[in-house]
A protein has these predicted regions:
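Dynamic "connector" segments at or just before major functional cores
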Residues: 1-191, 196-208, 374, 381, ...
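Short, conserved catalytic/metal-binding motifs centered on acidic residues
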Residues: 29, 60, 75, 95, ...
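Short, solvent-exposed helix-loop connector elements
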Residues: 41-49, 318-326, 342-358, 374-386, ...
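Domain-level cores of phosphate- or acyl-group-handling catalytic modules
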Residues: 190-246
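Flexible loop/turn segments at secondary-structure boundaries
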Residues: 82-85, 149-151, 190, 221-225, ...
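Short amphipathic alpha-helical "interface-anchor" segments enriched in bulky aromatics
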Residues: 29, 75, 263, 319-371
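An anionic, glycine-rich sequence signature occurring as long contiguous blocks
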Residues: 2-8, 12, 236-341, 430-432
Length: 433
């Protein structure tokens, strides 16, 4: 490799070069999933055919978010990249002010319709996700959780007190594997598990019957109706029990344990587990619990053992396997953090509640598109990676658009880090027409 000389002249060109030429895979996947048609049929806000249409407004936001640009201002970056707009099939990209004003016109009905579009898009990817999870894990992990979306300032409609005293909204979401299948953006001040039954029903409809589902929940979902729903669907489940009130009767039952009651669940014998049986107040039937006794925090031995309690649906599996499956919840918690971090969805951009609600639905669709690219266009080795890798190594790859013999051609550099992934994705598009 030759050394770059120090006296390089910097100049500019009119050639069609984009730092995000990998966006073509987003637009092609959106085309295959009928996203434009669904948005066009569901969202009718604009009254005049002037400027960007409803569909172009939303697609501009979705594609901007899918690149990890979570601020409304970032849509201006998209609008100035004409090559990227051409690859995405966008004729008119709104500036950030127009887009903000447009989101402010959403009401409950249009927000609900946009949420349905997101669910419809997820239903077109979920089969691939379920197949992969069954192949690699032997079961389909489902995770439902709520997270606080904090805001600062006095101009956020519907923001209220959160569990930690801060002000903000609640975002409740359901994931199947790494796919964000459904969500509810809610006003602050409510319960973290509000509308969990609706999320469960929508998730169950998408997953379908006949799959070995393992649903995982935090303490907020330690409720009889949640466990009953899972039993009715023949889902396995595990729920963390962290409230001191709920743990008290379980601790009392442990007083009769002897050392032989504990079973080692790791190779070095630093963790043991045992089954407990208890009927919580208000529940009709006795429930099965697993208690985990940990002697170490990393490599540091604890002065006293730490006990973790988990409500479980099964006792026919080895204790080590049950604990392993429940701890996989952490991986899906990270999947939930993925859109918030990598799509930069931590900060609601609008002052009105429904505008922010629409914004997070667009964020969900962006995540679904990224997972669809990952599962349908990339090789299997890419499935284990998070969406951050897809954004950085596929979407944000520079390319040059050229026209020769009346045909358009997109050129990527052969020095791209994930060149094989790009080649595989291009071959998939070519073979599918």
């Amino acid at each position: 490799m030759s050394i770059i000389p120090s006296n390089i002249e910097i100049d500019f060109t009119d050639e069609q070069i984009s730092p995000s030429a990998g966006s073509i895979f987003l637009s092609e996947m959106a085309k295959k999933m009928g996203l434009r048609e669904e948005l066009n049929a569901a969202i009718k806000i604009k009254k005049r055919a002037r400027g960007s249409s409803d569909t172009e407004m939303l697609l501009s936001l979705i594609y901007s978010l899918a690149q990890g640009d979570g601020a409304i201002l970032d849509v201006d970056r998209l609008g100035h990249d004409q090559t990227r707009c051409q690859l995405l099939g966008l004729h008119r990209v709104p500036n950030h002010r127009r887009l903000g004003e447009y989101l402010g016109r959403f009401d409950d009905n249009t927000c609900g319709r946009l949420e349905k579009v997101a669910q419809s898009q997820a239903s077109k990817v979920i089969e691939s996700v379920v197949e992969y999870e069954r192949e690699t894990k032997g079961y389909v992990p489902v995770f439902i959780d709520g997270t606080a979306i904090e805001v600062t300032g006095d101009y956020f409609e519907g923001a209220g007190k959160l569990y930690d005293g801060n002000t903000g909204y609640w975002l409740h979401a359901a994931f199947v594997g790494g796919l964000w299948v459904t969500q509810r953006f809610q006003k602050g001040g409510g319960h973290v598990a509000h509308e969990v039954k609706d999320l469960l029903k929508e998730t169950a409809e998408m997953v379908g019957e006949g799959h070995p589902v393992w649903a995982r929940f935090d303490n907020a979902y330690y409720r009889n109706d949640v466990a009953a729903f899972c039993r009715e669907r023949k889902w396995d489940y595990s729920i963390s029990v962290t409230s001191e009130t709920f743990k008290r009767p379980l601790r009392e039952m442990m007083s009769d344990f002897i050392e032989e009651d504990w079973e080692a669940i790791n190779d070095d014998g630093t963790e043991h587990a045992a089954f407990l049986y208890h009927r919580p107040s208000g529940w009709k039937q006795e429930q099965v619990y697993v208690v985990v006794r940990s002697m170490y925090e990393g490599k540091q031995r604890l002065l006293y053992p730490r006990y973790t309690f988990i409500l479980v649906s099964r006792e026919d599996l080895p204790l080590a396997e049950i604990v392993k499956r429940h701890r996989g919840k952490q991986g899906q918690e990270n999947v939930f953090k993925g859109p918030l971090i990598h799509l930069d969805l931590h900060h609601p951009p609008c002052g009105t509640f429904n505008a922010n609600r629409a914004f997070y639905s667009a964020g969900q669709i962006a995540q679904i598109l990224l997972v669809a690219v990952q599962m349908k266009l990339l090789p299997k080795e890419a499935y284990k990676h998070g969406i951050r890798t897809v954004i950085r190594d596929i979407v944000r790859v520079a390319g040059k658009l050229v026209r020769h013999a009346r045909k358009w051609k997109l050129l990527f550099s052969k020095s791209a880090l994930r060149l094989y992934w790009l080649s595989h994705a291009a071959d998939c598009l070519l073979s599918s027409g």
